[in-house]
Every structure is written in structure tokens, then in C-alpha cells.
Amino acid sequence: MSAAKSVSIGIDLGTTYSCVGVFQHGKVEIIANDQGNRTTPSYVAFTDTERLIGDAAKNQVALNPSNTVFDAKRLIGRRFDEPVVQADMKHWPFKVVSEGGKPKIQVDYKGENKTFFPEEISSMVLVKMKEIAEAYLGHKVSNAVITVPAYFNDSQRQATKDAGVIAGLNVQRIINEPTAAAIAYGLDKGKSGERNVLIFDLGGGTFDVSILTIEDGIFEVKATAGDTHLGGEDFDNRMVNHFVEEFKRKHKKDISQNKRALRRLRTACERAKRTLSSSSQASIEIDSLFEGIDFYTSVTRARFEELCSDLFRGTLEPVEKALRDAKMDKGQIHDVVLVGGSTRIPKIQKLLQDFFNGRELNKSINPDEAVAYGAAVQAAILSGDTSGNVQDLLLLDVAPLSLGIETAGGVMTALIKRNTTIPTKQTQVFSTYADNQPGVLIQVYEGERAMTKDNNLLGKFDLTGIPPAPRGVPQIEVTFDIDANGILNVSAVDKSTGNENKITITNDKGRLSKEDIERMVQEAEKYKAEDEQQRDKIAAKNSLESLAFNLKSSAQDDSLKDKISQEDRKRVVEKCDETIAWLENNQLADKDEFQHKQKELEKVCNPIISKLYQGGMPSGSCREQARADSQGPTIEEVD
């Protein structure tokens, strides 16, 4: 591959699926992976011999549930003891452990016990997306824009950025998913005049609502709301629980502790859910689900809607909140745009349509690809692309949560109110609470509650060396500065001494240290090298295997009987049989051994086979006719 050009890609790093796009020749290309799919499962699997990412990982999940990791986005930037993490762990077949209060995923890889941070798993998915883009573009890529849910907090954003760094990417910007989708929508429409657009983005694991005003290429986010923990997987969970109960009733057996049975059931439920978006009934047929019992059943759309009714209805709350924050009436919204695969569910569309008094919803953009599309446009802008339709584009995003410090009595004093356009900088002067107080503790919080104990502590630092003075006299200037990625810097200055201290809100909470990240970057390289080694090994094995079978069939071909002596034929067949037998017993041999065996085989057979082809048949060694390097793992079909 040639050296990296300055092209930048847009990656939608999703909970369940990811997608990558690039802007070139004046338009966005959403790039298909090696399986021809334009979205790639955000799955990483570890086996005794290799690591699989994407479709290959998801395809073998029922065979290897406890070492196939997904949903890393539901863990990223969170702490182990958060209630949502504890609740999720009940649904996951893989093991999550705590290390220093942070969640780590535990798997068996190549016979060893390994633990990974969520950032590392996400970085593996990002590497896959990067490779998909590189295969399409034909050169290395290092610059990227990565999207996150608008409602992601500071530590979740920071952790996503870290995942990009571990994947060897220069993350130019972290942008909000609904904002990215709005760019896709706005470019697609190109209508003049001001339009108020509500983006309703319901994906596999997260839910966002954003209201934007689009006018002449300026995208201004007015308000954002959502739930970083609601999506298609929660609907799958409801269906899985329903069928676990049904299995108990019908067969008096509990499958809830059997990982493989649960995984097969979940896959069937996900498929049924998709079917129910276009049909009123879906059947589920799983052979030998548990203890040899076949599970044949069906589910109607009405029953599915009833199972998820509270979750579906709950999606309207953030819509109302966003409208309130944007100080808009629902009649002022010109377009309601659907993004994310879960918006295909008819009931969700109906609830939303009824909420907007029967208004037609806008389905003009592809719900699976819109976010990556917008990210690719933003990537092009940041890389200095001057194509007519993107150069005038300006993106004004907002901070999703209020940010402030704790003042006397545990009160939350907000310096930056939620839905403030970013980047932004706000300064406020505070003072001491007691006479001759020598220092102050600046504690930074995010959240909307009046008391800090109900909000989320992002970090804290001390400002010391304040000269003795009566309370209320010293002037301490606190500045909050949010950059375009939504990441916060806080500084405090004692105006009398010029003494300053500051913090980038990254250290305390869920954030990896620089050393950790560097170590993970090296490990990622190591894993990549191992993956390539494994691919080469499989290629060498397949090459040897196909050569042996092809030679054997050539030697036994009746039409070639006259051209080869009985003795020669016997030698070829025997050597091939010997090689095939060796292969069966040495599946895990090294690449060099396979190549050595291939040379041995060629040494015996080449002279004999070349006699065959002297009569005007294709020249060249038998190696050429046997080049069938089928790459990659063999995948078993799984229900």
C-alpha cells in the first residue's frame, strides 16, 4: 500500500454495527467490507488460534459465546459499579471484571486468560473499519472523525477518543451522531430558507434526539436529549426473556444459565424483530435448543409491541425535553428525520407520527448509513476539502449536560449551561468560605441537579497558596473551556498572586493514563501481526491442501492415462495421500512446515506432471494450477 494520503474517513462506531465512509470526487462513498456488507458488526471474538473481528466474529458467536465480545460501547467510559453496567452484565455471555473500579472484559485467547478494557475492544473494531477503508482506497489511512451519541458524557467521549488512538488513528474530531445525520440530511436536501429539523436517532444501544436549525449550510444544534442506554438490544432482551419463560412453561426447563442456548435464542429473536417490521408475525424455529428439545414458536407484532411498550413510549420523553430546551413548539419543527436501525419498527414510527399530530416522517436518508455519511463529510471539511457542496458548511454543536463546580453547602454552580453552543469558554469569580483559608478545592461536576451529590463528578484539583485574608476577600477566577470535541478544560487563578492550577477533565474518571494507551497501541500492533501470521498460515495450509488434491485428481484422470506410466501415477497418488494424511494430523503446524511439505510434494510430482503437459497443454508447474488460497476462517452456519 502506498503512503497515507491526507484523506480522512468518517467512522460511525456503533453499539452493534459500525459503518465507514469517505468523501471523494464530490460525494460520500459508504464502503462495503470484505463480505460485501456496508455495515460491520461491532464484535470481536477470541479463539484458541486467532482473533476475529466483524462478520467472522458474529458468525461464530453461538459456538463461542463466552469469548465473543460485543456491546463495548455500553461499557466505554463507565465505571464497573454503575447500575447500568451491573444490569447489562446479566445479559452478556462474556465475563466483566473490575480493575481499579473500571470494567474489563475477560476472555480466553490462545489458551491464556486475557482481560481487555472496553477502549481496547472498540479500538479493534476501529482497526477493522480503518482496514475496510484502506482496502477500498488502496492506501493507508490515519485521519478519522468518529461519532458518539450526543448524550455521551465527558469520560465516554474521552474513552472513545482513546480507542481511536489505540487503533493508530489521528482522531481529528469526535462529533455527535444526530448532528452527523443532520449533515447527511441537509446535504441531501439542499433546500434554502431556515428549517427546524428534529433528528430521532434510535440505534442498537443508544438513543438521541437533537433539534437543529439548518440554514444556508449552517447547522446549529439547538438542543439535545436522549438515553445512552436504550436501543434495539433492549428490545431483543425483552423478547429473549419472554421466550425463556415460554420454554419454562412448555418444557419445564430453565435455559437462562446456558450461554449457547441463550445466544441462539437471541440471534433468532433479533431476526424475528426485523421480520416484524415488515410482517405481522414471525416464526422462530431452533433445532435442539436445550437438552435435545426443539423450540418452534411464533411471535406477533402486537405481542412484541406489548413486551416493549414502556420502552417504546419512553422514547417520546427526550423528544419533549429537547423541544422544551430548544424553546420550540412541536408545530415549529419542519422535518422529523429517522436515523438508526430501530426506527424501522412500525410502532415507534406511529408513536412519533401521532406525537407530531400525524405529520409524515422523513425517511429519505438511509438510517444505517446516515451517521457515517455525515462523519465523512465532516472529515473532508477538517482535511481542507474545498468541493462546492461542503466548503460552506458550518457545524455548531452543543454541550449535552450542564457543567459547573461545587460551592459552599454542596451546591452545584453551573458555569456552562446544557445546550450551550461549543466550543465555548466561561469564567466566573469565586471566593473563600472561611477566614485565612489557605487553599480551595475545585470540584468539577456535570449534570442538571441542584446539589452536586446528585450529579456526576468529573474531576477535582486544589488551588493552594492563597495569602491569609478574611472570607470573601480573595478572588479566584474559574474558567471552563470546552473544545470542539466536547472535552473540558478547567483552570483556576488566584488573582492576587497569579497562582494557577488547571485540569483537563480526563484524569480521574474512567480515563486511561498515557502509559496505558501507549501499551495498548503496542499490543494492538502485536495482535495485528499475530492475525496476519495466522492468515498467512491458513493460506499456506490451503495452498498445500489444494495442491495435493489437484495433483491426485490429475494423476487419476482417465484421459491422461496414456501420458503417464503406471509407476509414476502410483508415486504421485501415494505422495499426495501421504501429504493429505499429514495435513489431517497437523492442522496447527507452522507456515514454514506447510511450505516445506509443499516443496517436498512438488519435488516428487513436478517432473512427472510436466511430462503430462509436454503435449501442448498449459506450461508451468503444478503449483499454478493449485493456487486456491482460500483465506480466512471457516465459518459454520449457526441458527
Curated annotation (Swiss-Prot):
Residues 616-639 are annotated as: Disordered. InterPro entries: ATPase_NBD, Heat_shock_70_CS, HSP70_C_sf, HSP70_peptide-bd_sf, Hsp_70_fam. Keywords: ATP-binding, Nucleotide-binding, Stress response. GO terms for cellular component: cytoplasm; cytosol; nucleus; plasma membrane. SUPFAM superfamilies: Actin-like ATPase domain (SSF53067), Heat shock protein 70kD (HSP70), C-terminal subdomain (SSF100934), Heat shock protein 70kD (HSP70), peptide-binding domain (SSF100920). GO terms for biological process: chaperone cofactor-dependent protein refolding; protein refolding. CDD domains: ASKHA_NBD_HSP70_HSPA1 (cd10233). It comes from the Eukaryota. It holds the Pfam family HSP70. Transmembrane segments: none annotated. GO terms for molecular function: ATP binding; ATP hydrolysis activity; ATP-dependent protein folding chaperone; heat shock protein binding; protein folding chaperone. Belongs to the heat shock protein 70 family. This is Heat shock 70 kDa protein 1.
